[in-house]
C-alpha cells in the first residue's frame, strides 16, 4: 500500500513539475476559463498532453494545496476555479470517474457555486498558452538565436554593462510574466485617497511613479522599490496595495497596434512574411514566394524588425499646446517669407531650399521632416546592434526640432544589413509616408478649428556607408562610388584602393532622372551595375523624393571625422611622409596651447588632448575655434592657409543666414582646397571624403543649411534610446515601448487628474531653471546675488552675471568658474574688452569693461 501511494505521489509530482508555474498561475486566475473552446485546437501535441495531465491532476486536488487553506483564496476566484473544475470533470466523466469522485469528495460540502458569475477577462486579453512550450521545442532552430542568447547571458553576468546581477531588475516585455497572482481580482480602487493632506489617489501615485521612472530611467527593480517606499510612507493600511508592473503597463503603455513586428524571409531577405502586434502573436510556418523557403516564426525568431506608428506620434505633437504654438508660428513665418520673396536669395532654413520649394509648389502646404538611420551596438560586449529609423520634424523652431526626434522603426541584427533588408525595413515607413502625404492627419489650429495637415519627407541624413545601401549603389570604395556625380574613380596601387583625383573635365552631376535611367538599363540588360547603380530601390516610391539630392551632405562624418582627422594625422603621425610633418616638440606646443584655453560656456565641452578619442562636437570646436590660434607659427604657413579654407567653408555653411555671394565663395574655396590638397598631399590622399567636398554647396542649395541636415541630433538620439534599456531581454521592444511612454509625458498626453500632478510631471521633463533671476527689458536677465554701488552720485545694483540674448556674460569678480571665461566681449566698433561690472540702472543694463588693445595685433594676423 505504501509503495503504491509513493508511486502515485511521484507520478503526481512529475505531472506537476511538467507544467510551468506560469501556466498553473494563469489557469488558477481564470485566464484559461474557456480553454477547450479557444485554445485546444491551437496547441501542439506536446503542450496538449501536458495540459490534459495537469488539468486531471488539478481536479484530483480540487485546487487546494496541502499547505494552504481554501478560505484564504479570493471567493470569486475560487468559485470560478471550481466551476471550471466541475465542467472539465464532466467532460472526462466517462474516462476518469475516479478523478471526479475524488474531486467531489475533497470539495467543501457547504460550498455552492454561483453559476451567474461574470467573467472578468475578455478574449482579446488572453495570451496563448503554447508560446513558451512550443518555443522550447525549437531552441536549436538557428545559430543566430544561440549567439543572441550567449550575448544576453554574457551581458547579464558582466558588471561593465551597467546591469545589476539581480534578474528581477531586468525589464521584460513578456505580457504574461508581468501578471501577478492577484492582478485580476480588483482588490483595490484606483480612486482611493492615499494621502489625505494632498488629496492624492492611488491613480495619482501611479502617474507620479511612472513619470518619475521614465524621466530618470529606473529599472523594474528600482521602480518596485520606489513603490514600496511610497507605501511605507502612506501607512500600514496601504501595505497590501498591489501597484504592479502589469497595472502600470495597462494604464500607460501605448495601444497595441502602434508597435508592430515584421518577420522577413531568413534565406533571401526579400519578402516580409508576417506582420503582427505582440499581443496577437501566434506561431506560424510561412513559405517565401521569392525562394520557396519555409520559415518558422516564433517568439525567438531574430529575422524581424519593429515599426512604430509615425502618425500616432505626430498627433501627439499637435496635442501639446507648446509644440502646437511653435508649429503654427513656423507655418505663419513661412507664409510671410513666401509672400515677400527676397531678391538676395538668403538661406536661413529648410524653407529656403530648392527641394522644399519644389514640394510646396502647389496649393497644399506640406510640413517636412528629415529621416535618418544609423547603427550602434546594443551592448558593450555583445554582437547584436540596432538601427533606429528616426524622424526630425522641420516644422518647429530649430532648438525644439532637435529635441523632438521621433522613432519609426528598429532593426536589430548581428552584422551590417544588406540592401535587401534595408528595402524591407523602409517598406513599412514608405506606406505610412504615402498616407501622410496624400491624406494627412486631422488636427485643430490655434482657433480650435479642425484642419487637415499633410507631411512630406525632405532630406535623408545618413553617412557614406548607409547612403549607397539605401540608394542601392556601389559604395565609395568601388568605381562610380560618388553619391552626387559620375566620377569613375581610379585605382591607386600605393594604397590599394579607389581614389577620386581632379579631372580635366568635371564629371557629370547625377540627377533623379539619370538615376532612373541607370536603373532601367540594369533591369533590362541584367548587368551587375550601371555607372554605380546596382538596381531599383524601394525609396523611389516615397513622394517627392530626389533619389540623388534628397540625401544631404553629412559634415559630421565627412569633414569632422574625415578630412580634418586625415589632415591632422598627416601633420602629426610619426609614419607620415607629408612635407608638412611636425616635430614632436611642435605637437607638444600645440597640445599646450589647446589645454590652456578657457572657452566660454557656449562651448559645452572643455578642451581635451588630441591624443584622446574626441567626440564630434569636440572636433567641431577644434576646427571652428581652437585650430587656427593653436597652429599659428607652428604649422607651415602654406599648410595653414590651405587649412583655413576648410575652416571658412564650414563656418559659412553653419551660419543661420547665408547669402548667395557666400555660397559662391564657398564653391570657389572648396575647389581651391581640393585642388591644392592633391598638390600638397598627393593623389593617394584624394579620398572619397575629400572629393565630395566639391558637392557640399550644391547640397546646401538643395536641402538647406548644414546645421539642420546633419546627423548630430540623430547620433545623440541613439544614445538616448540606449539609455532606455534596463535589461538584456527584448531590448528593441523596451526601446519602442519606453520611447512612446516618454513622448506621452513630454507632450502632456497623459490623463492627469489634477494640476498638481500635471505640473510635477511636466517640470521633471524640463531643463533646470534659474533659481535667482531678475528681468531687465526683453533681452537681459540678471542672475545671482547683487549689491549696491554708488555710480555718478546714484545708487545702482551691481550683478556679477547676466544673460543677454541667450548668451552668458559675467564679470571678473565672478569666481565660481575656473575653466571657462565669459568676461571677454567684442564691440561693434571692433574693440575687445574685459567686463569689470554688470550694472542695472533705471531698467537699463550697463557693462563696465576694460579695453584690451593687444588683441588688435592678433586680429590683424
Regions found by a protein language model. Give the residues of each.
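Polybasic, low-complexity terminal segments and linkers that are predominantly intrinsically disordered
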Residues: 1-194
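Terminal interaction-prone segments of large eukaryotic proteins
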Residues: 3-10, 86, 112-114, 127-130, ...
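N-terminal alpha-helical interaction blocks
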Residues: 121, 159, 166-262
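Short, conserved catalytic/metal-binding motifs centered on acidic residues
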Residues: 226, 374, 429, 460-461, ...
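Structured nucleic-acid-interacting core domains from mobile-element enzymes and related host factors
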Residues: 254-267, 303-385, 451
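Cys/His-enriched microdomains
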Residues: 260-266, 286-289, 480
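Domain-level detector for long, ordered catalytic/regulatory cores in large eukaryotic signaling
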Residues: 274, 278-284, 291-335, 434-616
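Acidic, metal-ligating active-site segments
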Residues: 346-362, 366-415, 487, 629, ...
